[in-house]
């Protein structure tokens, strides 16, 4: 049986990264996976070669308009559309189609959170695509609807999940994530011009205003016996891609560095895509570039009485497209790690 895959939003950064990963997937090489319709809005009518010269294998493919009719007839549909647009398309696709949504439309469980941060009517919740979270891998196996997590919540959740579940910390965390400009997408913006970003760092959507704040709190709350307060600050850096997250929280009394390290090493011992670094080593965005890996370091600041956890991911791979392909693998029955690089690109 051949699985036919469509990508809506194929000309965006996430869509292009999904294509890159699918072309390296063993199922594509064997003929078990076929790349079907590639759609977008503003770039419809262009060839992929004009838009993505790094994908010469599909250079002659023409980008089509994004409609339910174009996407019908595929076994798997990846949605790389702006927030708020996915629901309209997804609701027109049949229940037998596996729909993997890279936008935020179906991530949040709390309707009030969605309406506060996104300003539209909540459309529901789908199985959430961080397989490393307790119970989520099982929910994703065979799932016909999947919500791919946000890039910031991925880095923050994987950094803090073991500490929260083990009760090492108080449920009050501070997260600072430094991100590359590709996280904002391809849309032209003065704030993202090279002359505005090069040689400069800038915090944005501070003081709890960023849309990923409730998603981080939701994820950590799943493994906590009480709600987790999250202070989240994103920082824009002059990098094409990558997220470096530093997360801190007050330690429970008596928790030692040895205990914290043991908790993290045990929690991630069987996880292919999370690597707890040796003591003293620090996560680097370059080390995970182009890979589906998350590198994590956990330390104790004894003077401050806090845990410090640092994580690094590629926002376009583990933070979006890699997670989407990982979820597809679980949904259709491929090996979970198929087609997903575990080695970064350096220098």
From Swiss-Prot:
Highest taxon of source: Bacteria
**GO MF terms, alphabetically ordered:** N-acetyl-gamma-glutamyl-phosphate reductase activity; NAD binding; NADP+ binding
CDD domains named in the record = AGPR_1_actinobacAGPR_like, AGPR_1_C
What EC number is given for this enzyme? 1.2.1.38
Which keywords describe this protein according to UniProt? Amino-acid biosynthesis, Arginine biosynthesis, Cytoplasm, NADP, Oxidoreductase
| Subcellular compartments | Cytoplasm
Q: Which pathway is this protein engaged in?
A: Amino-acid biosynthesis; L-arginine biosynthesis; N(2)-acetyl-L-ornithine from L-glutamate: step 3/4
Report the catalytic activity: N-acetyl-L-glutamate 5-semialdehyde + phosphate + NADP(+) = N-acetyl-L-glutamyl 5-phosphate + NADPH + H(+)
Is this entry keyworded Iron? no
Q: Which residues are annotated as active site?
A: 151
Q: Which SMART domains does UniProt cross-reference here?
A: Semialdhyde_dh
Q: Which GO terms describe its cellular component?
A: cytoplasm
Gene Ontology biological process terms from the UniProt entry? L-arginine biosynthetic process
Known role: Catalyzes the NADPH-dependent reduction of N-acetyl-5-glutamyl phosphate to yield N-acetyl-L-glutamate 5-semialdehyde.
PANTHER family in UniProt:
N-ACETYL-GAMMA-GLUTAMYL-PHOSPHATE REDUCTASE, CHLOROPLASTIC-RELATED, N-ACETYL-GAMMA-GLUTAMYL-PHOSPHATE REDUCTASE, CHLOROPLASTIC-RELATED-RELATED
The family note in this entry says: Belongs to the NAGSA dehydrogenase family. Type 1 subfamily.
Which NCBIfam families does this one have? argC (TIGR01850)
How is this protein named in the record?
Answer: N-acetyl-gamma-glutamyl-phosphate reductase
Organism (species): Corynebacterium glutamicum (strain ATCC 13032 / DSM 20300 / JCM 1318 / BCRC 11384 / CCUG 27702 / LMG 3730 / NBRC 12168 / NCIMB 10025 / NRRL B-2784 / 534)
């Amino acid at each position: 049986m051949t699985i036919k895959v469509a990508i809506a939003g194929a000309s965006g950064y996430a869509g292009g990264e999904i294509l890159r990963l699918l072309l390296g997937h063993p199922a594509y090489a064997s003929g078990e996976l076929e790349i079907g319709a590639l759609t977008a809005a503003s770039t419809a009518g262009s060839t992929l070669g004009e838009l993505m010269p790094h994908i010469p294998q599909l250079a002659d493919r023409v980008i089509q308009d994004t409609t339910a009719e174009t996407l019908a007839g595929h076994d798997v549909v990846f949605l790389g559309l702006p927030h708020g647009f996915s629901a309209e398309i997804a609701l027109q696709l049949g229940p037998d189609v596996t729909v993997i949504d890279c936008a935020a439309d179906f991530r949040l469980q709390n309707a009030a959170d969605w309406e506060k941060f996104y300003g539209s009517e909540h459309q529901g919740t789908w199985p959430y695509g961080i397989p490393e979270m307790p119970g989520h891998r099982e929910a994703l196996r065979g799932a016909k609807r999947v919500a791919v997590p946000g890039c910031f919540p991925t880095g923050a959740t994987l950094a803090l999940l073991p500490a929260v579940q083990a009760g090492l910390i108080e449920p009050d965390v501070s997260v600072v994530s430094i991100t590359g400009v590709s996280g904002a997408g391809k849309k032209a913006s003065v704030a993202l011009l090279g002359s505005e970003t090069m040689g400069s760092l800038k915090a944005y959507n501070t003081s709890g205003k960023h849309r990923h704040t409730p998603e981080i709190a939701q994820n950590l709350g799943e493994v906590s016996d009480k709600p987790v307060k999250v202070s989240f600050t994103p920082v824009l850096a002059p990098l094409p891609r990558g997220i470096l997250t530093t997360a801190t929280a007050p330690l429970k009394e008596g928790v030692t560095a040895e205990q914290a390290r043991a908790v993290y090493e045990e929690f991630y011992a069987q996880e292919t895509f999370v690597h707890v670094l040796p003591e003293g080593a620090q996560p680097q965005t370059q080390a995970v570039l182009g890979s589906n890996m998350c590198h994590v370091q956990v330390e104790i600041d004894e003077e401050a009485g806090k845990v410090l956890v640092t994580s690094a991911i590629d926002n376009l791979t583990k933070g979006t497209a890699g997670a989407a392909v990982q979820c597809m693998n679980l949904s259709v029955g491929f090996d979970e790690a198929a087609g997903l690089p575990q080695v970064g690109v350096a220098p």
